[in-house]
Structures are given as structure tokens and as C-alpha cells.
């Protein structure tokens, strides 16, 4: 019995530290983008380093679209009991918006507002709230995800794009 209790305590601690790490990454991303872009003008932020590469503006517009699409999925997991959610492609979603035409700072401002709201909602969740789940359809049949797995997905995705943003603005 003591081994099982120790394992449960260890799992809860690991779960809590993963949640803290995800919340830190999610809350820091907009600030990191602002620091990376500090002192650059719109022309620099809209410049593509080469024909097939995204500009800084396109990267942030993509992150904003992902945050909106995936953030809505998280909101549904929190507010509904195990919903079935049809997968929405952020790349398809962005084509329905004017995000790619907006100036960089407006896109970053809107992304930052969305992110602040998501982080606020996530911080209010009890530990068990992070395990709320949904079944996703549309790309793979019946794939399940949790609030934590989706929040982690967003954070990991953004880390890769922050590296891309740094490379883009160095070239």
C-alpha cells in the first residue's frame, strides 16, 4: 500500500511540475517574440529571407491562428464532458482571416491578448481539470487528447517557431 501511495504522490508531483513548465512556456512566448522583434521596423518584420521561407509576420500570424484553433479546443475540453471535436487546421483557418495582411505589432498584440486569456483560464484549473479530454476526428479516427496534452502541444510547437523566428530575423 505504501508503494502505491508513494507512486501516486510521485505522479502528482511530476504532473504538477509539467503543468508549471507548460504555463511558463505559454506565458513567456509573447514576451519572447516582443524581445526578438524589438527595434525592428515593419519592413524588416515582413521580409521573407528567401522565397520558401516565412517572414517574422507570417510566423507570428501562424502562431496566432494555432493559438486560436487549439485554444478553442482546450476551452471545449474544460467546459464540456469529453466532447468530440473535429480537427481544424490552423493553416486552413488562417486563410479565412486577414492575419497575414496585418502589421506585425497588431498581430502580436492580438496573440498576446489571446494567450493571456488562455493562461488565466488554465491557471484556475484544479489538477484534475488538466486531465479533461476530448476525442478528435478529422485527421485520425478517434484520437484522444487532454487539456495538458494540448497545452503542451501548443508550447512545444511555439518553441520550434521561436527558433525559426530568431533565424529569420538574423538572415
Pin down the residues of each PLM region.
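A glycine-rich, hydrophobic loop/mini-helix early in the fold
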Residues: 28-31, 35, 39-50
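Hydrophobic packing residues in well-ordered alpha-helices of helical domains and bundles
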Residues: 19, 23-26, 56, 104-111, ...
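Short, contiguous alpha-helical
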Residues: 9-10, 46-92, 119, 130-171
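Extreme N-terminal tail/first-helix region
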Residues: 1-28
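Short coil/turn segments at secondary-structure junctions
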Residues: 10-18, 95-105, 145
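Acidic/histidine-rich alpha-helical segments that form the ligand environment
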Residues: 25-30, 36, 94-131
Amino acid at each position: 500500500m505504501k508503494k502505491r501511495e508513494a507512486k501516486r504522490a510521485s505522479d502528482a508531483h511530476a504532473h504538477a511540475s509539467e503543468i508549471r513548465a507548460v504555463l511558463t512556456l505559454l506565458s513567456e512566448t509573447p514576451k519572447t517574440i516582443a524581445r526578438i522583434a524589438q527595434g525592428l521596423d515593419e519592413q524588416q518584420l515582413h521580409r521573407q529571407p528567401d522565397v520558401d521561407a516565412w517572414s517574422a509576420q507570417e510566423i507570428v500570424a501562424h502562431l496566432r491562428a494555432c493559438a486560436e484553433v487549439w485554444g478553442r479546443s482546450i476551452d471545449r475540453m474544460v467546459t464540456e464532458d469529453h466532447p468530440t471535436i473535429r480537427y481544424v487546421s490552423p493553416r486552413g483557418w488562417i486563410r479565412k482571416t486577414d492575419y497575414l495582411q496585418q502589421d506585425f505589432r497588431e498581430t502580436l498584440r492580438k496573440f498576446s491578448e489571446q494567450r493571456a486569456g488562455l493562461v488565466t483560464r488554465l491557471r484556475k484549473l484544479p489538477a484534475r481539470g488538466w486531465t479533461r479530454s476530448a476525442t478528435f476526428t478529422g485527421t485520425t479516427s478517434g484520437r484522444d487528447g487532454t487539456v495538458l496534452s494540448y497545452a503542451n502541444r501548443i508550447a512545444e510547437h511555439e518553441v520550434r517557431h521561436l527558433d525559426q523566428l530568431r533565424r529569420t530575423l538574423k538572415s
